[in-house]
């Protein structure tokens, strides 16, 4: 930080200094403006005893404020670039993990055959669970549709298709899925299928699930991994969000992925 002084000799030396300018940075622009303002001062102000006072308080405050704004802007730009590079590395690492490779063949809650290619051209948020889940699945689906609603409310953003795939095909047939998804979002799509079809889709996304022992009422709990998956319009797995991530955090992440998306198929 440069210190202003009342000494005429020191002030003369200070006025002769040429600030270093970093081309292309906001900090450099602030230093340019500082130098220009100093050159516009003309004769130094004098105090009661004829001693040079340097620039007035208002000018010094203006210079300090502009210099601080330049540094703040440069810091924000560096932070945004760092976040972009981190997201790029994360996306590449997830793709190398080969999550979501291959196709799946299931039935939606209206009885129509569905495969992964049906969602090409759309952003998709996908969750694996089961309709008899007492608490976690409803909470995660509510969070998922909250993200969808937040993004729907922003003009200019493409729509996001919410998808719920069962890991309990024994109980979650087409009718059960239809009753269940209607309580969350009008566009939430429920998918089910045979035991083999569900296992194939779950395995593709590295979803673990295991049905527990049945009680006297033939009821049981399915233990399964908990994550919301994001697929881009190319149908590629792009990111996932664990239970600890809030709807706001997921929405922010989806926005960033949308802004950075470039199709590899076109």
From Swiss-Prot:
Binding site for Cu cation: 133, 137, 224
Domain Thioredoxin: 85-259
Record field: transmembrane: 61-78
Presequence range in chain numbering: 1-41
Disulphide linkage map: 133-137
One matching Pfam family: SCO1-SenC
Domain of life: Eukaryota
UniProt-listed Gene3D superfamilies: Glutaredoxin (3.40.30.10)
PROSITE patterns: THIOREDOXIN_2
Any one GO biological process: respiratory electron transport chain
Keywords, sorted A to Z: Cardiomyopathy, Chaperone, Copper, Disease variant, Disulfide bond, Leigh syndrome, Membrane, Metal-binding, Mitochondrion, Mitochondrion inner membrane, Primary mitochondrial disease, Transit peptide, Transmembrane, Transmembrane helix
One MF term in the entry's GO annotations: copper chaperone activity
Effect noted on mutating residue 171 to W: In MC4DN2; renders the protein unstable
Tissue expression notes: Ubiquitous.
Mitochondrial intermembrane topological domain residue ranges: 79-266
Compartments, as annotated in UniProt: Mitochondrion inner membrane
This protein's record includes keyword Lyase: no
A cellular component term, taken from the record's GO annotations: myofibril
UniProt effect for mutating residue 114 to H: In MYP6; remains stable in mitochondria; reduces the level of the protein copurifying with COA6 by 80%
Keyword match Membrane: yes
Subunit structure: Homodimer. Interacts with COA6. Found in a complex with TMEM177, COX20, COA6, MT-CO2/COX2, COX18 and SCO1. Interacts with TMEM177 in a COX20-dependent manner. Interacts with COX20 in a MT-CO2/COX2- and COX18-dependent manner. Interacts with COX16.
Family: Belongs to the SCO1/2 family.
Protein name, per record: Protein SCO2 homolog, mitochondrial
Naturally occurring in which organism (per UniProt): Homo sapiens
